Amino acid sequence: LFWIGAIVVSTMKQAKRKRSVQKDEGFWAVFTHFKTASRTMLKDRRLFWLTIANAFIFSAPMAVLEFQQVIFENIGIVAAVFGFIYAAKRGISMLFSTFIHRITRSLSATGALFIMLCLAALYFFGFGFLQNQMLIIIVSLLPSIVVVIQDVVISDFRNKLIPTGSRATTISFGNFIGGILKAVILGAITLLTLFVSIEIAHVIIGAALVISCLYLIPMT
């Protein structure tokens, strides 16, 4: 069988042209997809503002997570505890994922965003003002709940508003907006630390987030 297979393979001709989806579509196809997604969002006012508000609330705490360990060390939490904290975050995410939809079933998208904003604000102001180690650890778990609400509840609302044919492209465009916001917020907090402490920088970012979202959320 081996030799028969070898003979068959040896008689096969190499393909004359290798096709590449990336090459066929070209780099500019990315912008075409984003153009389609932006049109989809602009046609539905609720979808547009839901995507923007969600990007702000979700991206802000995700952008500053890298600074958690600095604040932990500033208040005396030793590095050996970090692993337990991050394990607790994963546990919180798993736990809330199982029943978060039951809790938020009666909520509108606006209500879910408001809960996310409250949790994000508690995180920023907690890391800005708290000095108690246990309270800081508890507050550090809040972004995990924000992630669950975003992944389960907000995604459900968005999927109901997006036409089936452009769902993947529109969601990708929303993620792209979130990525830009993360970069901007990360750059902003880095610049702030040149003038104020990392704790005060958290308070400033948190205040800016609350002010922005108190305008954005009612639009949803």
Per-region residue spans from a language model:
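Juxtamembrane intracellular "pre-TM" segments in multi-pass secondary transporters
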Residues: 14-52
